[in-house]
């Protein structure tokens, strides 16, 4: 597949089940020598170089697999790509662990011959091989806890494709040399309880259809929540400065502060030696005489009268 070719997913699901807004396909990324050397530096670089996430948006839902989809895909390519960019930004801020909301089993893949880039139907029929995009059929199956636990033990096999820790079963499609379909393996039982959701990606990377690692439904619940900010808000609510019980509003009593000062002075006096105490008493006894000389008083009675 050439770079920039449109890719389409056709997902078979039960009619009463809710379709996903978008699907995220993790594909193995081809590595060059420069990418490999950069990936060895950090674990994040190794993970980024090993897998590439591709977002497929929901276009429409059809009632049967025989309904043409070229018109739906062509109409979806006309609007701006702002919604797809928004999903990509949200995806970068998503958590790594995803809820088990079901699994997707690969049924078949239709590869285009690469002779035309147009989405116009050929001869009035749905020419999948010459429609200018690649089509991959998936089946959405309800999660079976017992089967999921059994398949989780198969993760050691590097050739196993996992979706939410569940093995994907790829049913290959035989294609002739001219690009026409030869054998399309399909369930012979037709069930009216199923519908088909059409997803598309305008700029799919080369080789994505052969290197699928996992298929996950996109959800807004993947957005990160900063728990630290929430805890800080709780602490701010509890620490009200205007509250009477706040420790900042506790002031000591004036009487107790005076008693504390007196006790501190008494402790300091008791800590002095006998010689230091006699010197201090002598200084206090000479204090009135010094004041009398300074202010030219003739007798201590004049000092008391002031």
UniProtKB/Swiss-Prot annotation:
Residue spans of biased composition, Basic and acidic residues class? 31-43
Tell me which domain of life the UniProt entry assigns to the organism this sequence originates from.
Eukaryota
- Predominantly, its location class is cytoplasm
Task: Give the Phosphoserine positions (modified residues).
Answer: 299, 305
- GO terms for biological process? hematopoietic progenitor cell differentiation; protein transport
The keyword Cytoplasm is annotated on this UniProt entry: yes
Q: Which GO terms describe its cellular component?
A: cytoplasm; nucleus
The keyword Calcium appears for this protein: no
Q: Keywords for this entry?
A: Cytoplasm, Nucleus, Phosphoprotein, Protein transport, Transport
Where are the residues of the annotated region Disordered?
Answer: 30-49, 231-278
Chain intervals with Acidic residues compositional bias: 231-243
Protein family according to the UniProt entry: Belongs to the IWR1/SLC7A6OS family.
Q: What is this protein called?
A: Probable RNA polymerase II nuclear localization protein SLC7A6OS
Organism from which the protein derives:
Mus musculus (Mouse)
Q: Which gene encodes it?
A: Slc7a6os
């Amino acid at each position: 597949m050439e770079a920039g070719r449109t890719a389409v997913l056709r997902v078979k699901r039960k009619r009463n089940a809710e379709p996903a807004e978008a699907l995220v396909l993790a594909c193995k990324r081809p590595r060059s020598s420069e990418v490999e050397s950069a990936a060895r530096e950090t674990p994040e670089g190794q993970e980024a170089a090993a897998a590439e996430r591709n977002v497929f948006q929901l276009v429409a839902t059809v009632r049967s697999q025989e309904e043409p989809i070229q018109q739906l895909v062509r109409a979806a390519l006309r609007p701006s790509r702002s919604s797809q960019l928004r999903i990509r930004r949200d995806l970068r801020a998503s958590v790594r662990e995803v809820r088990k909301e079901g699994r997707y089993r690969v049924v078949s893949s239709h590869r285009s011959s690469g002779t035309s880039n147009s989405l116009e139907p050929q001869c009035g029929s749905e020419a999948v091989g010459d429609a200018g995009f690649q089509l991959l059929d998936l089946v959405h199956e309800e999660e079976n806890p017992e089967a999921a636990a059994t398949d989780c033990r198969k993760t050691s096999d590097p050739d196993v494709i996992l979706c939410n820790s569940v093995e994907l079963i790829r049913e290959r499609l035989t294609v002739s040399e001219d690009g026409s379909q030869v054998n399309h393996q399909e369930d012979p039982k037709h069930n009216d309880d199923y519908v088909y959701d059409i997803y598309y990606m305008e700029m799919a990377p080369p080789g994505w259809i052969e290197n699928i690692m996992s298929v996950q439904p996109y959800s807004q619940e993947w957005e990160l929540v900063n728990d630290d900010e929430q805890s800080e808000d709780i602490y701010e609510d509890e620490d009200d400065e205007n509250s009477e019980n706040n420790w900042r509003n506790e002031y000591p009593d004036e009487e107790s502060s005076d008693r504390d000062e007196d006790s501190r002075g008494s402790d300091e006096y008791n800590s002095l030696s006998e010689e230091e105490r006699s010197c201090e008493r002598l200084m206090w006894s000479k204090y009135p005489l010094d004041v009398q000389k300074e202010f030219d008083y003739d007798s201590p009675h004049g000092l008391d009268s002031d």
